[in-house]
Structure formats: C-alpha cells, structure tokens
UniProtKB/Swiss-Prot annotation:
Name of the protein: Nucleolar protein 58
Region (Sufficient for interaction with NOPCHAP1): 155-400
SUPFAM superfamilies listed in its UniProt record: Nop domain (SSF89124)
Quaternary structure (record): Core component of box C/D small nucleolar ribonucleoprotein (snoRNP) particles; the core proteins SNU13, NOP56, NOP58 and FBL or FBLL1 assemble stepwise onto the snoRNA. Interacts with NOLC1/Nopp140. Interacts with NOPCHAP1, NUFIP1, RUVBL1 and RUVBL2; NOPCHAP1 bridges the association of NOP58 with RUVBL1:RUVBL2 and NUFIP1. Interacts with PIH1D1. Part of the small subunit (SSU) processome, composed of more than 70 proteins and the RNA chaperone small nucleolar RNA (snoRNA) U3.
Lyase as UniProt keyword: no
Gene Ontology BP annotations: ribosomal small subunit biogenesis; rRNA processing; snoRNA localization
Keyword Secreted: no
Principal subcellular localisation of the protein: nucleus
Modified residues (Phosphoserine): 109, 304, 351, 483, 502, 514
Family matches, as InterPro entries: Nop56/Nop58 (IPR045056), NOP58/56_N (IPR012974), Nop_C (IPR042239), Nop_dom (IPR002687), Nop_dom_sf (IPR036070), NOSIC (IPR012976)
Basic residues compositional bias, start-end: 485-495, 517-529
Gene3D superfamilies: 1.10.287.4070, Nop domain
Length: 529
C-alpha cells in the first residue's frame, strides 16, 4: 500500500513495509516513537518538491477545494499507476476525485489517519534532504499566504494608504501655497512687474531659478519656459523696473526657496499619480462615479472603505458638512444639501437649481459603488460606468425639461399658480364629510323661506286694508247721523230704509263698496248742505 502525504515543501509518497502492524490501531503510535522504528513501518518512495511559496499555495488551495493539481496528477500517473497498489489519502473527497479521474483505488479509514499522525511526528527523519529550518520557513510562508487567500486579502487593497496619501496631498497644497506666496512677495521687492506678467506659479519659480538677478534677464534665454511674446515683455519690464536692488545673499535665499517649491510640486504630481492608481485598485467604481480626489476624501473622512460602506446614502450626501448641519439644526433652518460630494464633476456641471437633486441621486449610486468595491469579489469598474451613464442621461433630461418652444401649444406653456405663503391659515370645509346629497335640501329650504316671506307680505297688506276700511266706515256713519238730525229739524219726512249696523256684522260689507257709490254719497251730502 502507498501513502500520499502532503507537506509545505512538497508531495511525499511512502511505501508501507509492514501492513500487519496497521491492524493494531491503538498501538500503532508506538511504532513511530523513534525515526528508526518509523523507517521499519514506512519508506519514502518519491518526493516532489515545490519551487516556491506561490506553487505551494496553488497546490494547497486545490487540495482544500477537493481538486487535483497538475503537478500531483503527474506524480500519481508516474508512480502509483506503475505500482498497481491502493493509495491511502487523508481526505475522502480527494480520494473520490483521484478514483474518478485517474481510476486509482483510494483508501480512507481511521487506520490511515493514525498512520498520517505517525508520519507527521517523524517527518524530519522520514524525508531526507529537507532541513528543519527550511521546512519551518516554508510552513510559515504558506500559512500566511493561505490566510490571505482565505480572507481575500490583498496588499494592493489597503485603504490606509489612500487615507495617508490624501492627507499628505492636502498638506502639500497648503505648503505650496504658503511658499509661493512668500516667494512672490520676497522677489516682488526686486522685480514687482514679473508677478503680473507670469501668472503660473511653477513657471514663475523656474524663471527665478534660471535667471536670478533682474539684470540677467536681458541676456537670459527663456524660450523653453515662456512664449516669445511673454519673454519680450519680461525683458522690456526688467529694463524699466521700479524694484529695489537686493544683495546676492537675498537672491541665494530666494533661489533656494524656488528650488523647494519646484521639488514639492514635482513630488505632488508623483503623489497624485500614486493616489490615482491606488483608488483604481481599491475602489474603481467609486473613482468612476465621483473621481479620485472626492472618493479618497470620502474614504479618509469615514476612516476606511468598510466604514464608508456602512453609511446610508443620505449620510454620504452631507459627509463633510457636519458643522453646517449642526448649525442648521440648532437654528432650525434648512439643512445642507451636499458636503464633499459637491466637488464631484457631475454636480459641478449641473445648473444651480438641479444641484440638490443630482447630488442626492449621485449619493445613492455612489453608496452602491462603495459597497460593491468593499464587499464584492469583482474588481472591474463596469457597474460604475453603467451608473454614471444613467446619471448623465438623467441630468440631460432635467436640463432639457426647462427648454420650451417659442410657438408652443398649451402643454409647453407653464401654468402659473397662485402663490400661497406657508403661514397662510386655511379653514376646513366640512361639506365634504357628508355622503348625503345636500343640493335638494338647500333648494327646499330656500323655497320655504320665499313662501314665508310672501305670506308675511300678504298678511301685512291685508291688515293695512282692514284698518283703512274701518276708518272709512266710521266717517260714513258719523256723516249719516249728522244728516238724519238735520232732516228732523227741517221737518222733512223721508223714508230712508237703512238697516242699523250691528256691531257683530262683518266689516267686509263696506269694504266691497265700489268707488262710484262713494262719489254719489258725497254729491248727496253737498246738496243737503
């Protein structure tokens, strides 16, 4: 029987010399107490050594996944097939794969496990040609490599480098700004016109470093640094300059400062390229969405890429504007719409009225990109490119929405609505609460009110008529009494057939009398008088 034994140095295949002693499982460990006893049980038949740690890592990752490495396949075909003996393996899954692909009989049992323990205890004596120090070094290196592989760890994906690089880049910008401002003020006493002619700071320092004193500009060749027109202007200004004379020691110190500025500028460009490469390695999708600098500042502000991935989109949107946020919450005003994400190119190219909306959408897509870069296995930037294209299309639709045709239809014309202030008080209309019809009731009530008004008016008119008729009747009765008394005095006997009015008679009889009868009665009274 053959035994396949894997080590950190290579593959070892042993030949079992005495298979009878394998039957006693409990006492098998006694046979491996010393290297001499172990050599009586097993003997090394073949040893396939690994060339380096990378090869060992590939072999062991294949064994962990239950696969056969190419190197192992060659060894098994060469040695085990020729021997025509069963193969003892430590992993039952690996034995099944070997049996399936190479058609070799494999054994896995408690006896094999005990045999593997014995071989491992006397490995230095059973495998000649391998020093213990080399074995320990290979074992340690393989353990570290295997741990990195299991944890998906990569040295290129350490976001601490990004945090330090962006912090250093900001510090360099501040130092460069201070140095250049000091250099311009310092050399401005000697040649003040040069600062107005050359606006670029790096070119300004290179000119100073090349020329030095103002008197040397007439003979200096600045064609490598400046265009011909600017060079001629500088030389003309140097001849009629209003600056004061300075000593050689002052010029030396100014030139030394210019050298510092140029070196720091070159290092800054190198650091920026390093930051770009790191960002594309660690967070490619975030880099596509917001750019290298904004992405690095977001990671540095959160502390790490994993901490940033735990933030919500609303938090990422205002990350960097904490002072303004707490100030707004304290004074109960509107909170800020954006923080560090404001410096992204998508937000910068948007019109002011759409900046808040675009920053919100960009924050949502950026959070997806951050989580994909932090927890995803794929290191491509395809998702970031796709999401950026969607945001750019959305931005175009927002920008085109405000453009209307001059001779447009009613749809194109904007509807002006009445402005209502927030503090305007609105009353509640309870008419919408009832589900019963209210129109018929209102109409009935209105009709009843109108009828009541008509009846009241008629009653008032009737009362007025009755009063007028009563007054007329009283006048007529008084006139008749006076006429009867006069007739008695004159002795005229006239038979007047009149029925006395009773108090109980209805007063409507006189009211029915026509106006013609009244006229006749008046004429009679006049004749009698």
């Amino acid at each position: 029987m053959l035994v396949l034994f894997e080590t950190s140095v290579g593959y070892a295949i042993f030949k079992v010399l005495n298979e009878k002693k394998l039957q006693e499982v409990d006492s098998l460990w006694k046979e491996f107490e010393t290297p001499e006893k172990a050599n009586k049980i097993v003997k090394l038949k073949h040893f396939e050594k690994f060339q380096d740690t990378a090869e060992a890592l590939a072999a062991f990752t294949a064994l962990m996944e239950g696969k056969i490495n190419k190197q192992l396949k060659k060894v098994l075909k060469k040695i085990v097939k020729e021997a025509h003996e069963p193969l003892a393996v430590a992993d039952a899954k690996l034995g099944g794969v070997i049996k399936e692909k190479l058609n070799l009989s494999c054994i896995h049992s408690p006896v094999v496990n005990e045999l593997m323990r014995g071989i491992r205890s006397q490995m230095d004596g059973l495998i000649p040609g391998v020093e213990p120090r080399e074995m320990a070094a290979m074992c340690l290196g393989l353990a570290h490599s295997l741990s990195r592989y299991r944890l998906k760890f990569s040295a290129d994906k350490v976001d601490t480098m990004i945090v330090q690089a962006i912090s250093l880049l900001d510090d360099l910008d501040k130092e460069l700004n201070n140095y250049i401002m000091r250099c311009r003020e310092w050399y401005g006493w000697h040649f003040p016109e040069l600062g107005k002619i050359i606006s670029d700071n790096l070119t300004y320092c290179k000119c100073l470093q090349k020329v030095g004193d103002r008197k040397n500009y007439a003979s200096a060749k600045l064609s490598e640094l400046l265009p011909e027109e600017v060079e001629a202007e500088v030389k003309a200004a140097a001849e009629i300059s209003m600056g004061t004379e300075v000593s050689e020691e002052d010029i030396c110190n100014i030139l030394h400062l210019c050298t510092q500025v140029i070196e720091i500028s070159e290092y800054r460009t190198q650091l920026y390229e390093y930051l770009q490469n790191r960002m594309m390695a660690i967070a490619p999708n975030v880099t596509v969405m917001v750019g290298e600098l904004v992405g690095a500042r977001l990671i540095a502000h959160a502390g790490s890429l994993l901490n940033l991935a735990k933030h919500a989109a609303s938090t990422v949107q205002i990350l960097g504007a904490e002072k303004a946020l707490f100030r707004a919450l304290k004074s109960r005003r509107d909170t800020p719409k954006y923080g560090l994400i404001y410096h992204a190119s998508l937000v910068g190219q948007t019109s002011p009225k759409h900046k808040g909306k675009i920053s919100r959408m960009l924050a949502a897509k950026t959070v997806l990109a951050i989580r994909y870069d932090a927890f995803g296995e794929d290191s491509s930037s395809a998702m970031g490119v796709e999401n950026r294209a969607k945001l750019e299309a959305r931005l175009r639709t927002l920008e085109d929405r405000g453009i209307r045709k001059i001779s447009g239809t009613g749809k194109a014309l904007a509807k002006t609505e009445k402005y209502e202030h927030k503090s305007e008080v609105k009353t509640y209309d309870p008419s919408g609460d009832s589900t019963l019809p209210t129109c018929s009731k209102k109409r009935k009530i209105e009709q009843v009110d109108k009828e009541d008004e008509i009846t009241e008016k008629k009653a008032k008119k009737a009362k007025i008529k009755v009063k007028v008729e009563e007054e007329e009747e009283e006048k007529v009765a008084e006139e008749e009494e006076t006429s009867v008394k006069k007739k008695k005095k004159r002795g005229k006997k006239k038979h007047i057939k009149e029925e006395p009015l009773s108090e109980e008679e209805p007063c409507t009889s006189t009211a029915i009398a026509s106006p013609e009868k009244k006229k006749k009665k008046k004429k009679k009274r006049e004749n009698e008088d």
